[in-house]
Amino acid sequence: WEYERIPGFGKIELNDIVVFNYPSGDTCLTAPQYQAADFYGMVYQIGSELCNPVNLDSMSFAEQQRVYDFYYKVGRKYINDHPEQFGKVISHPVDRRENYVKRCVGLPGQTLEIKDGIVYLDGKANKQPDNVQTNYVVELLQPISAELRKEIRLSQEDLPEQMNRPGTHIFPLTPMAAELLASNKAVAQSVEKYDYPYYEWLYPMNLHTGWTVDNYGPIWIPAKGETVQLTLETLPFYERLIKVYENNDLRVKNGAIYINGEKAESYTFKMDYYWMMGDNRQNSADSRFWGPVPEDHIVGRPVFIWLSLDKDKNFGQFGKIRWDRMFRSVKNYN
């Protein structure tokens, strides 16, 4: 039967930490090594790797669409033809998708843009969370001690043994941690912000924008009852929302857009949408990769931390349970 959700009692506010169903998790692969992968990103990437390289910068929007459609068909066929590598392609209803926890950095009706890692809403900079992390290029002179690693909150996952050696490395750090590490001249010769390179498969995946995770947009976040003008240039930003989340039959024929069989030059949204991003800004799978989150994917707000484990320690080892974080309000991490 059709999926429905009982209306909630709360309202998502800007900078709230939110639990929601993974939007891109409607389709996934059964092979264990690919179960957590973004299916659509894989399809486009595989398709592009199997095709001859093309210069998208010199193409019109319509020409780009034909290229990306071809990438998708080639990538999807390759995955379907190699079940021994990828497993089966399966579908998940909304309530069976993985729960994600991210911060809401954009509300319905706002225009979002990211400049040098800072989120701007309607032209004004949004407040950065106190513990936001970005990647830094660190020139180590000697290994970071366990005490210093704990102080700057670097786990063994962030700092594996092969990286904790003299040389140049990339670490996720808060501004305070970066300042602390930079002040320790015996350990680090330099600590500089990492300039994240261009990555092709950001949202929307079927448009060559030239955006990066640190310089992204502008993009308008749809609001219920608001109308957007549809052209071949704007369609990639809202195509998935109209087709998948709002259950419409959308097609492009001879350069014209049709919704449910009728020629369409505009569309009025049925739901509110939210822009979610992780506080580990350059290492987060979030709306920059799969777009706005529809209201019917929202589960709620986390209230408190009931269990916190140190992933660098084994069970039975002193300090495995981080008692200082237990039962703390999630709001303490704003």
Feature roles, as predicted:
Residues 1-334:
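Extended hydrophobic leader/signal-anchor segments used for secretion and membrane insertion
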